[in-house]
């Protein structure tokens, strides 16, 4: 993805778990996007389940995809 300063951080709720550590996330601002788990979360075995609140980074280049960076 893009550099840290180019990303948009927003919160949302995981609505569906898809194969290959991909999730469908409903953002607080309205749209639903596809998001994958960041490498550090994968490395530390942080589990994400439907219903979890997460922080997602989105690039301005493709606002339909994102990276989950934090689980609340």
From Swiss-Prot:
It comes from the Bacteria. InterPro entries: NA-bd_OB-fold, RNA-binding_domain_S1_IF1, TIF_IF1. The keyword Protein biosynthesis applies. Its main location: cytoplasm. Coiled coil: none annotated. GO terms for cellular component: cytosol. Residues 1-72 form the S1-like domain. CDD domains: S1_IF1. It is found in: Cytoplasm. The keyword Cytoplasm applies. SUPFAM superfamilies: Nucleic acid-binding proteins. One of its GO terms (molecular function) is translation initiation factor activity. Keywords: Cytoplasm, Initiation factor, Protein biosynthesis, RNA-binding, rRNA-binding. Binds to the 30S ribosomal subunit, contacting protein S12 and the 16S rRNA. Component of the 30S ribosomal translation pre-initiation complex which assembles on the 30S ribosome in the order IF-2 and IF-3, IF-1 and N-formylmethionyl-tRNA(fMet); mRNA recruitment can occur at any time during PIC assembly. Belongs to the IF-1 family. One of the essential components for the initiation of protein synthesis. Binds in the vicinity of the A-site. Stabilizes the binding of IF-2 and IF-3 on the 30S subunit to which N-formylmethionyl-tRNA(fMet) subsequently binds. Helps modulate mRNA selection, yielding the 30S pre-initiation complex (PIC). Upon addition of the 50S ribosomal subunit IF-1, IF-2 and IF-3 are released leaving the mature 70S translation initiation complex. This is Translation initiation factor IF-1. It comes from Thermus thermophilus (strain ATCC 27634 / DSM 579 / HB8).
């Amino acid at each position: 993805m893009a550099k840290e300063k180019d990303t948009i951080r927003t919160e949302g709720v995981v609505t569906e778990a898809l194969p290959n550590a991909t999730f469908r996330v409903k953002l607080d601002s309205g749209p639903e996007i596809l998001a994958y788990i960041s490498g550090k979360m994968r490395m530390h075995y942080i589990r994400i389940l439907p219903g979890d609140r997460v922080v997602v980074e989105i690039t301005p280049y493709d606002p339909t995809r994102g990276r989950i960076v934090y689980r609340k």
